[in-house]
Regions:
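ANL superfamily adenylate-forming
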Residues: 5, 44-55, 138-189, 199
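Conserved AMP-binding/adenylate-forming core of the ANL superfamily
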Residues: 17-19, 36-91, 95-99, 116-121, ...
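Conserved pre-ATP/AMP-binding loop-to-beta segment of ANL
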Residues: 20, 35-38, 159-163, 175-197, ...
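Structural core segment of the AMP-binding/adenylate-forming
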Residues: 75-76, 106-170, 501-504
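AMP-binding/adenylate-forming catalytic core of the ANL superfamily
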Residues: 115-122, 132-134, 283, 406, ...
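Conserved AMP-binding/adenylation subdomain of ANL enzymes
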Residues: 216-233, 241-282, 290, 296-297
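Gly/Ser/Thr-rich phosphate-binding loop
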Residues: 280-285, 298-367, 381
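Conserved ATP/PPi-binding loop(s) of AMP-dependent carboxylate-activating enzymes
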Residues: 372-381, 389-422, 462, 504
Length: 550
């Protein structure tokens, strides 16, 4: 599946923003250049996540593993362009499977391990998944068996690490089949590489296809901003299912060859242990966590974080005092990222915005007269649009919805998964995020708010409309609104605001959603009872009023 039109390819390849790089090409280059260097390290708690001991693989060992699984996939019937779903925790096995799928020219659709029957069935149907790779056990859940029992029109073949019948850890297939396949394989950087899933304001998740071209345009920024290199040790706490895990760590890893240390699920003590024991030099962390650690320095006293020189953060506004605090107290530069699966790739790094408080508040404004921003920002353009009038905003201090064009932007949603065209009449991505022009000479953008109602809990997007549509079927519910409320660790948690028909409590709502097979991270953790939901003159629920009450 080729994604971008020829004129787009010509525009960005002629400018050098898109190159011929592919995932398999960079991977093979690292295997050749540094065969004996450690490539990847499993989480310390891997035995609690899935079967199999924690491993440390060199690039040569990783290459051999990826080839072995690639041959197994071919033997199973996977062909170039077929979609392979991968539902695994951050682990060696996840990286091996991703690389094996890319090796044979198939498409990866990575699924969060929290997905249950409801979300799995949607993804399998919408992406026409041919094979699903998982672990026989994920935590205390018999995950492979759950997938095998799914009632879907075209059930995928299930391959599992830890499967008693055919364990992917030891499964072998004819390597000659792989050699023959690779000999005839023609990979184009415009080929679809992944289909990630994003929760918008619609009830159904949207599929986000991305190719090598636009993925590596993102990578050029996420590698350059923290100045990543082959000598780094990078701790990855974000699931490799979306922009943060794939664009922020996985692809820079393939570009530079640093040592990638996997972490899953997020556990603060394990996270700090890994920084200490692995001598981590760079990691990612949500702003709420960095704020908490700065306010409670005693939590860091028994850990040695002296190897850590920079941290990437984002997904929510960064408190300026926090960014300055990490710089002044620990000598650690915090890099401010603002991204999305669709291709927003704004960042503020210490080179281009040295002042830590400005770095927390501002992002470079692409296309500003006299500006000379680095990387793909130089090939990007933005406009702020008044959502009510459609007028373009050019003066500072006036909020507008961000519209974005550039080499990091995707080509459009997977067919059948979006209600509306994500692009405006000029071909700009309509982001749904509100910014203002700010700073000296209007050089910067300042984030204001989310135009959409998404809840971001621990870096995972939750669509209120999805939960609302399900809870509307609860016999005790007259009407319901789902909103987020602040949390010091996760950023936000989920609250259900219910106008009830009969007595209703939080456990009954949670049990109702669990029966639907909903992922646990989406479950409400708070219930507010109201006589009626507040609405405006045209009947729209006033969610801002509800959030203010919380």
């Amino acid at each position: 599946m080729r994604l971008h039109p020829p004129q787009q390819i010509e525009r960005f390849t002629s400018g050098g923003w898109w190159t011929g790089d592919t995932v398999d090409g960079l991977f093979r280059a690292q295997v050749s250049a540094r065969p004996d260097a450690i490539a990847i390290v499993d989480p310390l708690n891997k035995p609690s996540l899935m079967d199999g001991a924690a491993r440390r693989l060199t690039w040569a060992q990783l290459g051999a593993e990826a080839d072995r699984i690639a041959a197994v996939l071919l033997e199973t019937g996977v062909a170039q362009g077929d979609v392979v779903a991968v539902q695994l925790p951050n682990s060696v096995e996840l990286a091996v499977t991703f690389l094996a799928v890319a090796r044979i020219g198939a498409v990866v659709t990575p699924l969060p391990v929290q997905y249950r029957e409801y979300e799995l069935a949607q993804a399998i149907r919408l992406a026409a998944v041919k094979v699903l790779v998982t672990a026989e056990r994920v935590g205390d859940r018999d995950n492979a068996e759950i997938v095998r029992r799914l009632d879907v029109p075209a059930p995928p073949i299930v391959l599992a690490w830890g499967d008693p019948a055919r364990d992917l850890e030891t499964a072998v297939a004819d390597p000659a089949m792989l050699a023959a396949h690779l000999k005839g394989l023609e990979t184009d950087p415009n080929d679809c590489l992944t289909i990630c899933w994003t929760s918008g304001t619609e009830a159904t998740p949207k599929g986000v296809p991305r190719c090598h071209y636009d993925w590596f345009a993102v990578e050029s920024n996420t590698t350059a901003a923290p100045s990543l290199h082959g000598g780094d040790v990078v701790l990855n706490p974000f699931p490799m299912v979306n922009m943060a895990g794939i664009g922020g760590v996985f692809l820079p890893w393939l570009r530079t060859g640093f040592q990638m240390v996997q972490h899953h699920p997020f556990d603060l003590l394990v996270y700090l242990d890994q920084i200490t024991e692995e001598r981590v030099t760079y990691t990612l962390a949500p702003p709420a966590l960095l704020t908490m650690l700065l306010r409670k320095p005693e939590m860091l006293e028994r850990y040695d974080i002296s190897s850590l020189t920079r941290i990437g953060s984002g997904s929510a506004p960064l408190p300026p005092w926090m960014v300055r605090g990490w710089q002044e107290r620990y000598g650690i530069a915090v890099i401010n990222f603002f991204g999305s699966n669709e291709g927003i790739a704004l960042l503020s790094d210490p080179v281009n915005i040295p002042d830590p408080e400005e770095r927390a508040r501002f992002f470079p404004r692409p296309g500003v007269p006299g500006g000379a921003w680095p990387g793909t920002l130089a090939a990007s353009s933005v406009k702020l649009v008044d959502p009510a009038s459609g007028e373009e905003i050019t003066e500072p201090g006036r909020p507008g919805e961000l519209h974005l064009s550039g080499p990091t932007v995707f080509a459009g949603y997977l067919a059948g998964t979006a209600d509306a065209d994500p692009f405006d009449e000029d071909g700009y991505l309509i982001t749904g995020d509100v910014f203002e022009i700010d700073g000296p000479d209007g050089r910067y953008l300042r984030y204001v708010d989310r135009a959409k109602d998404l809840i971001i809990r621990g870096g995972m997007n939750i669509a209120p409309a999805e939960l609302e549509s399900l809870l509307a079927g609860h016999p005790a519910v007259v009407e319901v609104a789902i909103v987020g409320y602040p949390d010091g660790v996760l950023g936000e948690r989920v609250c259900a605001v219910v106008a009830p028909r009969d007595d209703v409590d939080l456990p009954s709502l949670v049990d109702f959603l669990k029966e639907k097979g909903i992922a646990s991270y989406k479950l409400p953790e708070r219930l507010e009872i109201v006589e009626a939901l507040p609405r405006n003159a045209v009947g729209k629920i006033l969610k801002r009023d509800l959030r203010e009450r919380l």
